[in-house]
Every structure is written in structure tokens, then in C-alpha cells.
Amino acid sequence: MKAIFVLKGWWRTS
């Protein structure tokens, strides 16, 4: 479930 972490990090950075 690494995609979830990456997506959350990207969304927060955006």
C-alpha cells in the first residue's frame, strides 16, 4: 500500500 502513502504525500505537497 505504498501508493496510498505516495498519493497522500503528493496531495499534501500539491
Curated annotation (Swiss-Prot):
GO BP terms in the entry: L-tryptophan biosynthetic process; regulation of L-tryptophan metabolic process
Transmembrane segments: none
One Pfam family this sequence matches: Leader_Trp
Keyword Amino-acid biosynthesis included in the entry's annotation: yes
Keyword terms of this UniProt record: Amino-acid biosynthesis, Aromatic amino acid biosynthesis, Leader peptide, Tryptophan biosynthesis
Protein's job: This protein is involved in control of the biosynthesis of tryptophan.
Name the record gives this protein: trp operon leader peptide
Gene field: trpL
